[in-house]
């Protein structure tokens, strides 16, 4: 019997549909990746949605996998890329010139002189951290390790400086941005997010979370930066406004602010006796370095705790806080494409004997400066450097889901902050 022509066999149709579905899936993942790296809301939305469906550990495994692929791609596509500078640094022998507040690079917003910010510290020696130079002399960009002043509105002398390091000899695109804050002239305050850290103390259930910079202080606020991990990522402690939102863990590293205006950082068990004198404290994982020594765990081949659930060797965006040896300078760091050991060594190079890692991942670490948006005079946020996610309303009019810190000039003659 002659064979009649028929429609394509089912296997062919299935193969075609599978190819279409595969292509659509790849396209969707690519679009999702672009969205996460473009919109500040996309990363948290995707991560939190996935955690509620497949669980925290599975999301962490997925993140490790995706970041691992990204690092392999970068190692191939950027292997001949030289370390990059983000702002101009005065040449050797040329007097240091005050830079203007704003995004990194040669531009940025002008430093408007607003009467709303106190003019502080004029009778004290000018603040300037000591240059540390590059971590790797043969693997650096011009100006690595040199402090560049940030001049903010209403303050005649720079109270904050910035520098850049390239801390990883195997990745030219690994970058460590550090801001130094003069704690003799600046107040740093801690604000709970609208949802994080989730409280685990009954006394904190009725705590009213403002989750943004109080309006009366927005006139003089200079900068703000991210806080720590979500409660489900380690249960690290937080205390502010006289309320313990999350019970501290003895082994956690903690940054303390005290009623006398001083700051300390270290393992919580060593600072527990100082809690009654604290205005606030915020914990994170074990100190990456303490008293000048790198944590032994960061030398191990497989470490998870410094990324909460992520592996310590995962190449991601990270943030950290530290103090100089005298406790007079607060350093805040934010990175691109670094492992936990690389971040820790970079902070030791800056001159910080004890280092506390804060939040990680693409969307969460951020440092923003605040300037007036001429001509309407509306305050807006500006990123420290290009490539960091933020919104104009960051910490101002938009409530933050996660906790954060903000920075004000100390008001001469006013009492220091007291916890209720």
What does each model-found stretch correspond to?
Residues 16-246:
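Zymogen propeptides
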Residues 1-15:
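N-terminal Lys/Arg-rich, disordered targeting/topogenic segments
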